[in-house]
């Protein structure tokens, strides 16, 4: 959070089902492999494979509620290596860019 202040929780004034569907579509559009998607548990788990070295990175998207709004939190972590040279942050920026499109 501190290193990437633009990657904060997003709040949407929409129905939970609509936000969840849009998140799932965004993940699929980005080419992520959906590992688990469970509307009832408000969670999507996915894997993205890097182009050059074929490293697998894990993404978890969770959904909550706040004052009749849907709160979306997304995290991306690399399975190998110490640093990712911003790949995880860029992955989440691409995801939220799709989520925030009208």
Where are the regions that the model predicts?
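Ser/Thr-rich, low-complexity intrinsically disordered terminal regions
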Residues: 1-102
């Amino acid at each position: 959070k501190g290193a990437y202040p633009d990657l904060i929780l997003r709040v949407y004034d929409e129905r939970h089902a609509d936000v969840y569907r849009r998140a799932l579509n965004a993940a699929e559009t980005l080419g992520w492999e959906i590992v688990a998607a469970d509307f009832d548990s408000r969670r999507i788990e996915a894997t993205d494979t890097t182009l050059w070295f074929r490293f697998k990175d894990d993404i978890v998207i969770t959904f909550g509620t706040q004052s009749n709004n849907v709160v979306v939190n997304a995290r991306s972590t690399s399975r190998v290596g110490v640093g990712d040279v911003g790949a995880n942050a860029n992955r989440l920026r691409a995801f939220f860019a799709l989520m925030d499109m009208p």
